[in-house]
Amino acid sequence: MMHLAKLMRKDGQNEQALALCRKALALAPQDAALAARGRTFLSGDVPNWHFVIVTDAVRNAAYDTALRRAIKPGMRVLEIGTGTGILAMMAARAGAAEVVTCEMNPAIAEAARSIIERNGYGDRVRVFCGHSDKLTLDELGGRADILVTEIVSNNLLGEDVLPAHEKAMRDFMKPGAQVIPARGRVRVALAEDSRCDEKKMGKVDGFDLSPFNNLRTPEQLIRVGHERLTLRSEPGDLFDFDFASELVCAAASSKLTCRATGGRVNGIVQWIALDMDRETLYENRPAPGTTSCWSSIFHALPAPIETTPGQLIGVAGSHDRHSLTIWMEDR
């Protein structure tokens, strides 16, 4: 039965696979080996970042503050990306009459329903299991007053935040509906990563393997509080997205000029800023000792450069609505 569940998941029948796994576990509750396989199966489709994101107290406070400020009695809230259900419960706690939250992963949706019931919000929070583009207005129960999401990745765009917001604003939201976060920005700065070259290949057993370095990804995730990273310029916004717009945001390119503070630069570091509303900002700017559930992304240069204080250096980028490419312009 568990083997069949795996085959069904591989075939994209996620809800049926989950139900079959649950049935197998229920039929043999004393089977320790089956229980172990069941735990592996249930967790196999759940990204580990779910266990990190809810521990970000600054992120939690930013969302909670914005929700409390926005929600008025009687409002309906739509959330895209349930996860643990924490933001949906925050919305209900802030006074929303109804919260509908979309979760495309059946195992996560099931866990979220259990969490929401356990915390006493089952009468006001409803989990829709499916991608938000499968939701209908009838299932939502009418247009919503507030849209809240956290489907942003380290580069902001990787979880299809743009198409999800555009469809929601067109099909599900009332005119003038508030969106939390209202805007998302891609921020960049010149930087030095003191460990950038650690994994580069050189001579191994007398053989020069350095040409293989051309195949190494130039993008590396770095925790924002890691001491290996030093900013070598003031930050700037490479892209700024209005999440409340129903207009399609086309693929685009952008450039800005960074004023170097001086010193060795071997890459460009990118992070995100979320303007929850006009008063509340969440930003995971790299700095010693800071923490964030999102990492910065270090874009290594082909070769390091030495900069002088005040030197102007061009940084450019492009996005295709889903992914992001960043580079230093020719000097």
Region annotations inferred by a language model:
Residues 2, 9-11, 22-26, 31, ...:
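Class I SAM-binding transferase module
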